[in-house]
């Protein structure tokens, strides 16, 4: 092996070590950047609220170095060790045109999905797709919302007025024992998190999410999953 080949192997080995998993409460989120593009401005404008009825609160899933959360075992109460990160939380966004509608996917990560001790699984990803007419008009209109639920979706086209606060749809995260957690629309106000769009993540963070193994769940906005998820979330 020549010197350049050896150095390449060392670099790849170092990167793989650096971009491993770390404790769920040690993942530092991205600060919400200033929006500079039409799509980024629309994503902030329509950023949703999430109300937590039971279970974990959202946590960041990846840091700027590409290290991803190791999650939590399903021991203890549904919200045990996951009532919120001291570093702050995160909502992940990705958007595109799909069948003539503008789709904005907002995704949250939870360290575990456990209705009660021993039930459920490590890691949970839930998301809502907000469908609007056009991000590049003065007053875009919400046409529909598709919250994720147990590998499928609920469809609201359009969502009811009491489940939208201004331009922010309101979703609820809840488990109806013994079934795992899911999202649905709600009239209850919730919390918001710093938004980071897919194109605003570092290269390392995108690579970390693309290659991460989240067990029984997956990040719906990664390169392998995004378009397929939009097809399943299509509400029209």
Curated annotation (Swiss-Prot):
Signal peptide: 1-19
Pfam families: NPP1 (PF05630)
Motif Hepta-peptide GHRHDWE motif II, residue numbers: 120-126
Motif segment (Conserved undecapeptide motif I): 103-113
Induction details: Expression gradually increases to a maximum at 7 days after inoculation of pepper leaves.
Domain of life of the source: Eukaryota
Predominant subcellular localization, coarse grouping: secreted
InterPro entries: NPP1
PANTHER family: DOMAIN PROTEIN, PUTATIVE (AFU_ORTHOLOGUE AFUA_5G00600)-RELATED
Family: Belongs to the Necrosis inducing protein (NPP1) family.
Function: Secreted effector that contributes to virulence during infection by P.capsici. Induces distinct chlorosis at 3 days after inoculation of host C.annuum leaves, and all the chlorotic areas gradually turn brown and become moderately necrotic at 7 days after inoculation. Leads only to chlorotic areas, without necrosis at 7 days after non-host N.benthamiana leaves infection. Induces cell death in hot pepper.
Protein name: NLP effector protein 3
């Amino acid at each position: 092996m020549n010197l350049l080949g050896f150095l390449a192997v060392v670099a790849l080995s170092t990167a793989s070590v650096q971009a491993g998993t770390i404790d769920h409460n040690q993942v530092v989120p991205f600060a919400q950047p200033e929006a500079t593009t039409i799509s980024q401005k629309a994503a902030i404008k329509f950023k949703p609220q999430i109300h937590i009825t039971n279970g974990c609160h959202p946590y960041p899933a990846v840091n700027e170095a590409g290290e991803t959360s190791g999650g939590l075992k399903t021991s203890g109460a549904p919200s045990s060790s996951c009532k919120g990160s001291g570093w702050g939380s995160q909502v992940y966004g990705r958007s595109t045109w799909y069948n003539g509608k503008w789709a904005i996917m907002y995704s949250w990560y939870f360290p575990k999905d456990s209705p009660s001790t021993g039930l459920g699984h490590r890691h949970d990803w839930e998301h809502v797709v907000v469908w609007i007419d056009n991000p590049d008009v003065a007053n875009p209109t919400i046409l529909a919302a598709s919250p994720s639920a147990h590998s499928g979706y609920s469809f609201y086209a359009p969502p009811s007025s009491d489940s939208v606060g201004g331009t922010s749809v309101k979703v609820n995260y809840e488990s109806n024992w013994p079934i795992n957690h899911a999202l649905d629309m709600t009239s209850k106000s919730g919390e918001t998190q710093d938004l980071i769009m897919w194109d605003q993540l570092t290269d390392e963070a995108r690579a970390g999410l693309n290659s991460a193994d989240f067990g029984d769940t997956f990040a719906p906005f990664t390169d392998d999953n995004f378009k397929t998820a939009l097809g399943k979330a299509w509400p029209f």
